[in-house]
Amino acid sequence: MSNSKENKWRISVVTPTLRRPEEVDGLLKNLSAQQQLPIEVIVVDGAPEHENATELVVNRLRDSLPFAVYFIRHNGGTAIQRNVGIENAKGGLIALLDDDVRLEPDFLKKMVAVFSSDADSHVGGVVGYRTNRHFAAADSQRWRWYKRLRLLSVYEPGRYDFECGYPINNNMQPPFAGTREVDFMTTACAVWRREVFDSGLRFDPFFSNYGVLEDAHLSLRAGKRWKLLQCGDAHCIEMHSPNGREDRRKIGYKSVINYYYVFSDLAGPLSAGQQFRFWRFQAFELLRITMSAVRRRRLDDVRDVTGRLRAIGGLIRRTRRNERTLVINAKS
């Protein structure tokens, strides 16, 4: 990794993908319209060797793009794919972009302006504003219940609740100008100072195969040393492509296991109060999705509940094993 003075504000884009050739095509064309062009785009494809649709897209567009584009085949899930891209990036700034995100033409220029105004280099990362993802908590029945039952101790978008282990959805932030400080950043549209990664920080291998909350885990670890900001002037949209996504059973499972891992890793050892608040929140989520499955008769909700129950059972069994080990060690 190089970070010479002339390289300081040059941007490398890292994008993991899986079976989304059309989305990658759209992203590369979108990036070519940026007022401040990246020096390179690194596409890391998780598809097996015989599936070459995305590689063909990259090869077809390569010569017409105003930046270098590299194709790397590497599976293991988006967290591992991003690590591979980061290792190969040359820019002083590294943009982590999802393949289904489309940036406004001045997006990268606005991001660079935030970093260049940070004279003391305290800012480690800046996340953009997804204009099509905003919702108000008052309009969400789920979030109204969260507040009514006092399940959370903080409700500011972009903050992490260290009392119950839940990240507060950044999309609840109304449109704004300038920057504001956050605890975590999505990997959909964030730009990082390369020194953050030069220090050795990477996405945790725990999030291999299918990541849920890997972005918050990375951000919260980075936030121990660096300031993280959201730029309200750097606009983009997220199309939320249905292609290449896992089934709801795995998402439900990860929504328990990964949340517990992040909470215990960053706030542990967890107190009895933190454990209670974590499981109270998980119990509410299980009840909410179960009721949705009954009311709407949606198979996806049933799969979600099945995954959550499997995860809860696994964590309970692991806790009991750990307790037995402690007792045995105490007696020996």
Write out the residue ranges for each language-model feature.
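Glycine-rich, basic loop-to-helix element that forms the pyrophosphate-binding segment
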Residues: 72-89
